[in-house]
């Protein structure tokens, strides 16, 4: 199996509506659903939820 099949690169987009994104990798086997993480949005200047983009 190729490296990118199990752990693809995904974009996390801010739910604050600022358009800010983080780029990370995710393990599809352990987390098959869309992930949400609370991270810092420098445009909004606070911690907000970031959701996986497809």
From Swiss-Prot:
Keywords: Ribonucleoprotein, Ribosomal protein. It comes from the Bacteria. The keyword Ribosomal protein applies. One of its GO terms (molecular function) is structural constituent of ribosome. One of its GO terms (cellular component) is cytosolic large ribosomal subunit. PROSITE patterns: RIBOSOMAL_L33. GO terms for biological process: translation. The keyword DNA-binding does not apply. InterPro entries: Ribosomal_bL33, Ribosomal_bL33_CS, Ribosomal_bL33_sf, Ribosomal_zn-bd. Belongs to the bacterial ribosomal protein bL33 family. PANTHER family: 54S RIBOSOMAL PROTEIN L39, MITOCHONDRIAL, LARGE RIBOSOMAL SUBUNIT PROTEIN BL33M. This is Large ribosomal subunit protein bL33.
């Amino acid at each position: 199996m190729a490296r990118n099949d199990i752990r693809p690169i995904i974009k996390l987009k801010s739910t604050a509506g600022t358009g800010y994104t983080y780029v990370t990798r995710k393990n599809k086997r352990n987390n098959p659903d869309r992930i949400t993480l609370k991270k810092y949005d420098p445009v909004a200047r606070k911690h907000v939820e970031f959701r996986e983009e497809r």
